[in-house]
């Protein structure tokens, strides 16, 4: 993606039990600051600080792409991120802004499911943090059976794609508790953002 664009960055970091959410907050801030430095317009949402669902719908209409930042909890996103999706996406359906319908037609009700989104041309990207090593995602016979990071997040991609967006390359930080390498994570993430989004 090149030339100046408008991006929404959503921080799904969450303080809970033994985690304070600091790494995810830092990665979110890195995305915000890097995209701004590249010359793009950026709006941010920190889910833990609260949000107005109607204002969030307007951000989805405004943006060219959204960057989701979140930890991997129990093989998926935190409940606060799912709550955001349920509230904001549903608000956009009710107002016929994000989704018109489920894409099917009475003439052929078995075809076209998931094609009724109104955000065609927009994109989404996942940035996540996991204590699992990358091999747990990619290696055949390992925990995720070779599904890969995007395979584990298929449901999340599909929630976004139901709106009409298409996916950008995902980013993941691994071993974040067992062997944290924060400076490397941040350097790798900046490089990833620069490669995916480019300078405005």
Regions inferred by a protein language model and the residue ranges of each:
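Glycine-rich phosphate/pyrophosphate-binding loop and the adjoining helix
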Residues: 2-3, 24, 137-138, 142-200
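Structural motif
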Residues: 50-58, 178-185
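N-terminal beta1-alpha1 ligand-phosphate binding loop
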Residues: 2-38
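Flexible, glycine-rich phosphate/dinucleotide-binding loops
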Residues: 16-17, 51, 133, 179
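Helix-loop-strand module that forms the ligand-binding subsite of alpha/beta enzymes
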Residues: 54-156
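Hydrophobic/aromatic beta-strand patches that form the interior of the parallel beta-sheet core
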Residues: 8-10, 43-45, 67, 125-127, ...
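A short beta-strand-loop structural module common to alpha/beta enzyme folds
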Residues: 38-51, 171-174
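A structural motif corresponding to the C-terminal end of an alpha-helix
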Residues: 34-39, 116, 122, 159-168
């Amino acid at each position: 993606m090149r030339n100046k664009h408008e991006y929404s960055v959503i921080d799904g970091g969450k303080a809970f039990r033994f985690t304070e959410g600091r790494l995810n907050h830092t990665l979110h801030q890195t995305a915000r600051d890097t995209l701004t430095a590249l010359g793009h317009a950026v709006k941010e949402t920190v889910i833990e600080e609260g949000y107005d669902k109607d204002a969030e719908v307007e951000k989805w209409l405004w943006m060219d792409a959204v960057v989701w930042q979140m930890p991997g909890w129990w093989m998926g996103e935190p409940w606060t991120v799912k709550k955001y999706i349920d509230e904001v996406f549903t608000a956009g359906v009710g107002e016929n802004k994000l989704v018109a319908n489920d894409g099917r037609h009475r003439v052929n009700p078995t075809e076209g499911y998931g094609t009724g989104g109104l955000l065609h041309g927009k994109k989404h990207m996942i940035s996540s943090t996991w204590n699992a090593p990358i091999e747990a995602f990619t290696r055949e016979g390992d925990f995720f059976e070779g599904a890969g990071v995007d395979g584990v997040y298929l449901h999340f991609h599909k929630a976004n794609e139901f709106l009409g967006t298409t996916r950008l390359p995902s980013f993941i930080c691994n071993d974040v508790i067992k062997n944290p390498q924060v400076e490397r994570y941040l350097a790798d993430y900046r490089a990833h953002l620069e490669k995916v989004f480019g300078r405005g």
